A protein has these predicted regions:
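Intrinsically disordered, low-complexity regulatory segments
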Residues: 1-162, 166, 463
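Amphipathic alpha-helical transducer elements in NTP-driven molecular machines
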Residues: 9-16, 33-36, 40, 76-87, ...
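C-terminal or mid-to-C-terminal helical accessory/interaction module adjacent to the motor/catalytic core
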Residues: 93, 135-219, 255-259
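Conserved ATP-binding/catalytic motifs of P-loop helicase motor domains
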Residues: 124, 194, 299
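Metal- or metallocofactor-binding catalytic centers and their adjacent structured scaffolds
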Residues: 232-266, 272
Length: 692
């Protein structure tokens, strides 16, 4: 008996159907010599700091850094039942070996291995590694199972990624939270991503538009523009001179035959970028839709960083293109050309090939899919047809004219063969760059043309563009790429599988927010995000360092870098950060959340703000506090109210009436005075104004 362990129930059911495990058990399927079960995501996770020492339950600066010598793991509270099922299945005497069928990637490997080790299992493991959930791909995968030991390096890389994130996240979050008196979430990848948004927004705020001017010659069938000028008077003078001249001489006519190559197939990041541009989808939405399509056997594995197919897939491409073209009605009257060599390159495929629709998609009722999945599937189908198409060819004409001693220029573009663009429907990727400039009339050098008019054009320089998810994904993908040697396999921060989650986490934590209309949303930093980047040191927010870590993780995955050395570097960086970091002076003003101020602290003069529990001095070093659940006032039969707190803060005293004494069983009036000690802590004294 073999135990197959998938990542999700839906995947487990697809595998069970193909291998004949058709008898349902409690949390598993059984049949034909197989048991098939699932993990439901991360069943086993790293323990929190307090599991190592109870003192870590409270966040204290003096306890940092927290660097576990022996890592501890725990079963997720929400998935204990499924973990128990898996443990029993692994311990069954008739189970001789296991098949790891979690997602074929770094995180999928980690999910399986952590469960395997937490259960104390020692049985041999084989690996199912597939890029499609189609029945044929599953059958082939089970026929070509690989020894689990081949993926030990992949597991090491996953462990390093998880533990590095824990070390940086736990220590940096506690460090800055303790120093600045509020929870400040810091992450190995999250914070550099935030820093890019903050810096872009700062550049936009600092940008000062500069006006520019130019003269434009108007002919009967076209226009020609002159060079930009900073001074309006200079441009106006040129306009007047051109009007006086009344004509222009054609000094240059240059014609070139050009072509535009078909776009590459999609990897996850390029698909997310295109879906954001065309459809306004967030990166997470695109990943979710594509994952759903994958589990329905309609597209191949989504979390890939490759835009090519493997050499052995070349014979399959023509038939796939044909059935997809007909099924999706992509100009079906004439077969699309298929230049398969354009999309085939095994050397550029890492774990998984590019995302493409499957043959199953060709026979599927697409109208039954949710609209988001329909849109993504259609986008993938169109891209497949375009990617194997012929180049788009066009004639480009550059014309220069002279008038009043100045040069004017225009460009024309005439498409001679639409090629792949006839299937594209909507503009693809650099559409604005590829837009046609229009036809020009027949012109020759030396011709004199009468002017139909001369216009003064005014404009302003543009600020940097705000980040959309498209642009931020691009920035994450290429972060510090200029610092890496040519030929490295992956650059940037995060991975295709994690970038969407990073963006969503920044939004959820309130560091960035989405602004704009339904189609185009911009990612903008909040005050909270700006404040965090202000106080976090360069090594934490640097895309360069994070990209370097990502590169080393990839090398660990390929057995080219020592995992212990990597973890040592992470620990050293964090230890150095804790020892050397000093709180930024004045940053407490930036870090202060909005609150209702009731007055100035009688001890230090800072603002006194209301919170859920009372009224406290905003200066964290000052101990002045008026608790809402105040024992002193409760013994008087009184509750601390906002009005009472205001009187104590601003006047140093408050008059209380109808106070009750349990000892004498009598009511009385009194004046309560507030005094402060050296640390600012409040103390109360009563001044009696007579009994009642």
């Amino acid at each position: 008996m073999k135990l197959v362990l998938a990542e999700k129930p839906s995947v487990a059911m697809s595998l069970s159907k193909v291998i004949g495990a058709d008898q349902r058990g409690d949390g598993y399927m059984e049949g034909n010599g197989y048991l098939v079960s699932w993990c439901v995501g991360h069943l086993v996770e790293l323990s929190q700091p307090e599991a190592y020492d109870e003192k870590y339950a409270k966040w204290k600066y003096d306890d940092l850094p927290i660097l576990p010598e022996h890592w501890q793991y725990q079963v997720s509270a929400s998935t204990k039942k499924q973990f128990g099922i898996l443990k029993k299945l692994m311990q069954r005497k008739d189970v001789e070996s296991l098949i790891c069928a979690t997602d074929a990637g770094r995180e999928g490997e980690l999910i399986f291995r952590l469960v395997y080790h937490q259960c104390g299992c020692k049985k041999p493991v084989e690996r199912l590694w597939i890029s499609s959930m189609e029945d044929s791909a599953i059958r082939e995968g089970f026929q070509k199972l690989r020894p689990g030991t081949e993926y030990d390096a992949l597991y090491e890389a996953a462990l390093c990624r998880e533990r590095a994130d824990w070390i940086v996240g736990i220590n940096a979050t506690r460090l800055f939270s303790c120093l600045y008196g509020q929870t400040l979430n810091v992450g190995r990848v999250m914070t550099p991503t935030l820093a890019m948004v903050v810096m872009r927004d700062a550049a936009i705020r600092a940008f000062k538009p500069e006006p520019f001017y130019s003269a434009e010659l108007k002919f009967r069938n076209f226009q020609a523009g002159g060079e930009r000028m900073k001074e309006k008077a200079e441009a106006e003078k040129l306009v007047a001179e051109c009007c006086q001249a009344g004509s222009a001489i054609i000094t240059k006519v240059e014609q070139k035959e050009k072509s535009e190559k078909p776009p590459a197939l999609f990897d996850l990041t390029s698909l997310q970028r295109e879906a954001n541009r065309q459809l306004g989808f967030t990166a997470q939405q695109t990943l979710d839709y594509t994952q759903a399509l994958y589990e329905k056997k309609l597209v191949t594995y989504p979390r890939t960083d490759s835009r090519y197919l493997t050499d052995d897939m070349a014979p399959l491409v023509p038939e796939l293109v044909s059935v997809i073209q007909q099924s999706f009605q992509i100009q079906p009257d004439e077969p699309a050309p298929v230049n398969a060599a354009q999309v085939i390159n095994s050397k550029k495929v890492t774990d998984h090939h590019a995302i493409i629709p499957t043959k199953t998609a060709a026979g599927y009722d697409i109208s039954s899919l949710p609209s988001g999945e329909q849109a993504i599937l259609t986008m993938l189908a169109v891209r497949l047809i375009c990617a194997v198409g012929t180049p788009c060819r066009y004639a480009e004409t550059i014309v220069e004219a002279e008038c009043a001693g100045q040069k004017f220029r225009t460009k024309g573009k005439t498409v001679t063969d639409m090629g792949w663009r006839q299937y594209a429907g909507k503009p693809v990727e650099d559409a604005e760059k590829n837009a046609e400039a229009g036809d020009l009339p027949e012109l020759s050098e030396g011709m004199t043309l009468e002017l139909a008019g001369v216009d003064l054009k005014e404009g302003k320089t543009s600020p940097p563009k705000r980040f959309t998810e498209d642009l931020l994904l691009s920035a994450m993908e290429s972060a510090s790429s200029d610092e890496f040697p040519a030929g490295v396999e992956r650059k940037g921060i995060g991975t295709p599988a994690t970038r969407a989650a990073i963006i969503e986490k920044l939004v959820q934590k309130g560091f960035i927010e989405r602004r704009g209309d339904k189609k185009t949303k911009y990612l903008c930093s909040t005050d909270k995000g700006n404040a965090l980047v202000t106080v976090v040191p360069e090594q934490i927010q640097s895309p360069s360092m994070t990209a370097d870590w990502e590169e080393k993780l990839l090398k660990i995955e390929h057995g080219e870098y020592d995992s212990d050395a990597f973890m040592g570097e992470i620990s050293s960086m964090v230890s150095g950060l804790v020892k050397t970091y000093e709180a930024v002076k004045g940053a407490n003003v930036l870090m202060q959340p909005e609150c209702k101020v009731i007055g100035s602290c009688p001890a230090c003069g800072s603002d006194v703000c209301e919170t859920a529990n009372g009224w406290f001095c905003r200066d964290k070093s000052c101990k002045f506090a008026l608790w809402k659940e105040n024992r002193f006032f409760q013994t008087l039969g009184k509750q601390m109210t906002e009005e009472l707190a205001k009187q104590l803060v601003n006047q140093g005293k408050a008059r209380l009436t109808h106070c009750y004494s349990k000892k004498s069983n009598r009511y009385y009036d009194t004046t309560v005075h507030v005094e402060t000690g050296e640390d600012g802590a409040a103390a109360f004294k009563l001044e009696f104004g007579g009994n009642k």
